[in-house]
């Protein structure tokens, strides 16, 4: 993401993860890669959140614009289980009622889910391991960036010169933001050919106020394979982003012409 912070979610359960899950889920849930019909998934979950006990949890995905339940289970004494055929590898979401809790990759194998007041984790299969390693690393970088503000206040209170503090922390902030953006970019590149690449790309794009081509996006697209560019959501975003770039250029030309006309 080209920003230094991610908004936290207002929902009581999904706030346990730093990422704004509800904001990115619509993009995640649409990204599907069809594979063998003979594979099976098994989810074994545990929760230390007492409010979940006795509640029904659902796996949901979007199909043809409609929310569809893929599977469900009741939380009994802090545990829940789901299993079924993995007809496709897809991004799904674990829900309680209408609250999105966490994204998952539904794929062949045993997926271990852990829910607590401070952390959400899914592991045990290759893509879930990759996804949550990515989330953890990016969140840790975000925490370091947020810590710079508190560090500035401490340094000033300790008597440091304000201008010197600004200069030092600005450099530290630029370094951390670059590290985070480079990490996100490389993760997308490394996962061009599976659901994680398009998913994280759309997460990144969802932080923009509207579709637009940024240097980071242009850099990613320079090396992206055709399969990535032809992904429905990626292709739709790029089309809108390029249209917006043309509008921005037209507005610039109109302002320049108006400025020149006013000087005559």
What label would you give each PLM region?
Residues 129-133, 183, 188-195:
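Soluble oligomerization/assembly scaffold segments of membrane-associated complexes
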Residues 10-46:
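Bacterial Sec-dependent N-terminal signal peptides
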Residues 37-181:
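A non-transmembrane, solvent-exposed segment enriched in polar/low-complexity residues
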Residues 174, 186, 207:
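Short, glycine/charged-rich beta-strand-loop motifs at protein surfaces that mediate ligand recognition
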Residues 1-13:
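Single conserved hydrophobic/aromatic residue that forms the stacking wall/gate
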Residues 4-7, 22, 235, 261:
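N-terminal non-cleavable signal-anchor helices
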Residues 189-192, 196-264:
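Charged, long alpha-helical assembly modules
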